[in-house]
Structures are given as C-alpha cells and as structure tokens.
Amino acid sequence: MVRKFRYENDYPIVDTTCGKVHGYEYDDVIYFKGIPYARAERFCDPKAYTWDGVFEATAYGYSCPTIEEPALDYSLDFARKQELKDEACQNLNIWTPALDNEKRPVLVWLHGGGMSFGSSSEDGLCEGDNMCRFGRVVVVSLNHRLNLLGFCDLSDFGEKFKNSGNQGIADMVFALKWIRDNIAKFGGDPDNVMLFGQSGGGMKVTALLQTPEADGLFHKGLIMSGVQGGAMCDCNGSGKKMGEILMEETGCSNIEELCKVPVKELLGAGKIVRKKLKFLGYNAGEMPFYSDYYLGDPLIHPFRSETAHIPLLVGSTFGEFNAPFSYGISKHRMTDKEMEDKIKETLGEDLASKVIPLFKEAYPERPLVDVLSMDYMFRSYIRSYMKRRTELNDCTWEYIFNLDMPMLGGVSPLHGNDLGFVFNTTDRAPALQEPGVTEKVQKEVFDTVMAFAKTGNPNNGSIPAWEPSKPGDFKALVFGKETAVRRNFDAELNDCMAGELLEKQVQFMYDSVSGRIGG
C-alpha cells in the first residue's frame, strides 16, 4: 500500500477567523492539530484568541492539567498515549478529506474522563483519521477546562467569576461557535454538526443539550455510556465553601491570590477537600453547576423543549464497570450448575432465583454466569432518560454494545470497548481482534454512526430496520455476533438487579473516579 504524505510551505493552509493554520496531508486525510480556539484567565470566561502569521497545526495541543501522575498503561483494549498539560488547553483538532466547498457532515468528539480528567489525544482509538477516510466526513475533537479549573463555582466572590462553575461547558460552546464560523473552509457543513462522546464525553453531550447558549450549534447527538446520575449528578448549591477551603489550604487571603496559585498546588488542595465536601453535601467543583447558564441534569430537572427535537442515539456496553468480573472465570468451561452456584454465592439465593430466569430470557445467547458481569447502573439511567425523552419526541434511539473481547475465555464488553467500533479503529487495539467477527460488528456500528451523522436517522443496509423508541415501546439495537433489535427485553431484569445493587454500584464507580482524580 502506497501512502502519500504532503507538507508544503503553502499547503495545506486555511485562513480562519483567528489566523492562518498550517497542517499536513497523509493517506488521503488532511490533518490540523492543536488549533487554539480561545484563551481564558483562570476561572473566567473564554475569549477569542488570534495570531499573526501562520500557526503550525501539526501537533496536538496541551490538555487540561489534572492531579493524576503519569503512569504506564498496560491495556490491550485501548491505545493510550501520554500528553502535555497546561491551562492554555482550549484547542481543537480537525481531520478532513479535502479543503473544498463540499458540505460534509461534521462530527465533534467530546472526550471521556468525567468532567475531571482526559483529553482529545490520550487514546489512539479516538483519532478521527479513519472516520474521515472511510466515512467521508469532517471530524473535530477538542480540549477544554476540567475539574476545579472548569467547574469550581466561585460566583460568591465577584461578578468576574459568575460562570466559573461552568467554564468547561463555556469552553465547549466557544469551540462550537468557532466550528460554526470556520468549518466550511475545511470542507464541512456548519448546519450539519453531530456531537458525540463516551462516558464523560456523553455527559457533556447531555449537558450541552441543557445549555441555552449552545442552541443551534449542533443538530444531533450520540451519547455513549454518558447518562449518569446518583453520585455523579449536578453540583447544586454555592461553591463558596469550596473556595474558602481552597484559599485556606493554599494560604491565600483572597480570590485574586487563588487565581495565581501554581496549578499543581491548586489541584493538590482540591484533592484534600473534594471528597469531604462531596459527602457533606457541599458543592465540590467536579460537575457542571446548576444555574441560568446550565439548566441541570435532565434526570433531575426538566428536559429543555428547545432541544427536544434533536435526534439522539443513546446507549452503553453490556458490561461497563461490572465487566472485570469476567477476568476471574473461564465461563465457557463451566457447567450450568457451576454457573448457578456461582451466581447464588455472589448474589444470594433470593436475588439469584429472580434474576436467573430473567437473564436467560433477555440474553439467551450468553452464558448464564454473565449476569454477574452485566451492567445495570448505566442501563438504569439510560432507561430513565429514554422514558422521559420519548415523551417529547420520536427521534431517540437506544442501543447496547454486546460483543465480548476475545481474551481470557471471553470478557464482557467493558466501559469504552465500543470506541474503536465507532471510530473504525479496532485494528489499533489487539484485544478487540476476533477473525470474522470484529470487522462485521465494526462495519455495523460504523455504518450506523455515519448514517446518523449524515441524515439524523441511523438506519442503513448493515443493520436490521430500527425504529426510534416510544413511550412503553423501547426498541434497543443490540450489536453483537447476531445484531438484532430487541423490544422491552431487559426491563424486569434490570429493575431486579438495580433494585438490590444500584447504590453499591454507584458508590463503586464514584470511588473509582475519585481514586483517579485524587479524591
């Protein structure tokens, strides 16, 4: 295979509203990386950033600082990378097939990591080159402020900090405005923009649907494992206590001094106070702040009628955070009795007797013991989301990614195992490779996402006919070895598991996230 690379003094160059950017072309895709779309003082609103001359957009920009320490990554199902961090993190990346006047769909990727960590460049599975190359679309990914830098409400300390609790969202809105004003020069259609994100990225899609300033800047959305509630819900109430303790921990006498504290010291102080504040019921600066700018989590507050017409795909993986249970067993070597005994040992006799027949009915293709690696947290929140949103429209579809990883005798799909299938990049993760299966399911998922991005309807020739869900009639497309649409198939099973175990699962997830961001 011959792959062409091109980089000239005058090509490829695009003159944006901020200044000229210089990228490169490789293998029929034109890349622009690290384009600054804004800059901001700490805790303050983003502002336009301009430059003279030509900006070299050939390397990823800074990601938002976090409290995490760099660590080696040993995963076989992702393609993790390290990145540089700085508060000047408002930058975006663009992949396009051509710099022409053709109006291609624009897909804007919002990275995962809750609202506290992550970046647009940390996972090679989420790079937009293959999506661009094989889907003939324009792909954009972006970085924005996170954690205390993006979501610490300091509005009690002055008008300058009025929206400090939502600056992460404000950055995303600013980026979407930049895309609206510039993407046509990159071969994209500003009137056909799809937001998509996984985990925290999906949460960002739900947040932008609840943000009036984002209205008109996007036209459809894909929410992957991103409908979350419980311990992950809104920061309600004033962040004044957080600000006071941060100043105390950093030795600052006023908010202006806090704005100048070295970022590592600031985030270190946040590590000390965040978990204590969370469980005392105070705003801990980790999620969007309910206000007239952001109108709240739709599982708690009303869905906005202004965005109810926007088509959505909403889904999750079969296993999510419960999938690691699969690591410790060889399920294909177990007898039915051994599976039932394991379920009874783990769940107790009463719960096991209820869920075993329900699981057999919902997932007849799966070994019975997989009920222990089945997600019921994300699925519960998605079902609540679907019930509420389908009362407002007929343009919301739900899916479940149900393909095991071919390792350790078959591991239920983890949180994020659908990423490579959406981006058409499964070849970058060894543990996703199963001959004759991976390519089939990748084509089904990828074609579905491309159809949805182009038309607002996910139906295409690679999947069965799939109608949007309606109240009381929920039709989930279950991607797997035998992809099929299933109607109202897991409600009783999910309610049974969640009713007994949801609170523990939410706490487990919260503790896992806290461990990563220093809670």
Predicted regions mapped to residue ranges:
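Non-catalytic accessory segments of hydrolases
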Residues: 1-166, 190, 432-445, 455-463, ...
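Serine-hydrolase-like catalytic core of hydrolytic proteins
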Residues: 74-255, 303-324
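Active-site rim elements
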Residues: 78-80, 161-166, 229-234, 299, ...
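Non-transmembrane alpha-helical segments in soluble domains
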Residues: 107, 173-176, 180, 206-209, ...
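Substrate-access "cap/lid" subdomains that shape
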Residues: 181, 215, 224-339, 369-391
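C-terminal, loop-rich substrate-recognition/catalytic regions characterized by aromatic stacking residues
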Residues: 307-354, 486-519
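Alpha/beta-hydrolase fold catalytic core
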Residues: 348-392, 397-402
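Mobile gating loops/cap/lid regions near enzyme active sites that modulate substrate access
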Residues: 379-519
